[in-house]
Structures are given as C-alpha cells and as structure tokens.
A protein has these predicted regions:
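C-terminal structural segment of proteins
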Residues: 1-243
C-alpha cells in the first residue's frame, strides 16, 4: 500500500515530535486521519470494537461506547493534555509502541486485540501483548495498518484499576500498571508499562505486586524503578477494590 520511505500519519501527536527531532525522516507522509473507515464503532454482546482513527478526546468525552464504569473514558482523560487528546488517535498511539503509552498498557490488561488491514490478503487479529516487539517497534508487516481495536466485554462483576506515576501532569509515566479481574470469565490480568519494552503481563495468581520485581528482572530497570512498578500495581489493585 505504501511506497518505500513513506509513513502514515493520522493525528500526528506521536510521529510529529519524532519529525521535529529528526528521529524519523520519511520521504513522504500519507495522511489517513480523514478516513471514516478508521473511525467506526461496533458493539456486540461479546466485544467492543473501536476504530483506530478515533481520537483520545472522543473516548474521553463519551462520544464512543465504553466498558465498565467509564473505564476507557478515564484512561483517555489522563492522556497528556487536551490539545494532544483532540488530535491523537487510538491506533496511532498503539502503532507508535511507546512503552509508557496509556492505551498500550491498559488495553493489554483488558485482553485487547489489534485488528489490521492489508491491501493484499486478509488482516490479522493480534493480541496486544504480541503487538509490540520492543520500544517504538511494532509487529506490523509491510503494507499492513492498524484498523481497529477489539476489546472483550467484561461481565457485570468485573473490576478494574489503573495507576501511573508522573512527576507532573501530562508527561509520560515513569511507572504504570493496570489490573483487571473478571471472576465470572475466569480472567485476572495485570500489565506493567514504562518498562523499556513491551508491557509485562502477569496472569492469574501472578497478577500481584509481589511478582513484579521478579518479572522485571531483565527489563533494565534499576531496583528503584522495579519497586516503583510494584507500587503502581499495588495502587491499581487498590483502585479495583483489592485482590
């Protein structure tokens, strides 16, 4: 779909700063922000599908369906600043694959899938924990773009919490964690972000603060950083009502 050296741009809130600092130097940009096909929303009893072109502000303002007690809206509320939320998109944030991106860690904890589109062949449904190959590296193939995100619908008794530690409002987090517990579906997941790579996922009984430092042993974080991540998960669990 793209010629060599081209990059897609939607809201420009992730790629724009990289262009400013010459960290990305594509030969041309292909603007996709106006494509209505990327802003579609679908609801079923089993799942919620959100188009990749939806802005953070649309989700924060309740212009899209939500999960639980405004779980997604509260996540979007705390992304950067209003100017960024007005233009930044769900799909762009995920494709950028910043380890400290809010959507990446939270939607991983919720068991989300990235749905892709390809000009040749069928698209894929990629579990979010398999979507990121490393810091600022995703697993999209040539000619493949993020089309939407699919989130399993939680049961009425499901619980959720999210916490991130920032020195000041609006900046990227230094430690972040999300916790999701759905006993009716037999699902308990935690995701740790801002850990120098893909979100670290803890499942079942391992989704507890005591498991964080061991899980981050190879992350490159120092002892203080690993401890901050354990505290972030502890606070996310507290938001959800405890274990």
């Amino acid at each position: 779909m793209l010629t060599p050296g081209a990059r897609l741009i939607a809201g420009g809130q992730s790629l724009g700063p990289m262009l400013n600092f010459r960290l990305a130097r594509p030969e041309r940009l292909v603007a996709i922000g106006a494509l209505s096909e990327l802003r579609q929303v679908q609801e079923t009893p089993q799942a919620l599908l959100l188009g990749a072109g939806l802005t953070h502000a649309a989700i924060a303002d309740g212009r899209t369906p939500d999960l639980g007690e405004r779980w997604l809206g509260r996540i979007a509320d705390n992304i950067a600043y209003r100017a960024v939320r007005n233009r930044g998109t769900l799909g762009g944030s995920l494709a950028h694959a910043d380890p400290a991106a809010d959507w990446l860690v939270t939607l991983t904890a919720l068991g989300g899938f990235v749905l892709t589109w390809r000009a040749r062949g069928s698209g894929r449904a990629i579990p979010l924990e398999a979507f990121v190959a490393g810091a600022l590296r995703n697993t999209l193939e040539d000619g493949e773009i993020v089309q939407a995100v699919r989130l399993p619908r939680p049961s009425p008794t499901a619980r959720w919490g999210y916490f991130k530690a920032c020195r000041k409002p609006g900046e990227f987090a230094h430690a972040m964690a999300a916790f999701f517990d759905d006993p009716e579906r037999g699902v308990r997941r935690a995701a740790i972000g801002a850990a120098n790579g893909p979100p670290v996922v803890l499942i079942g009984d391992r989704a507890r603060p005591e498991a964080v430092e061991e899980a981050l042993a190879l992350s490159g974080l120092d002892a203080v950083g690993r401890r901050m991540q354990a505290v972030a998960l502890d606070r996310a669990i507290a938001q959800a009502g405890g274990l």
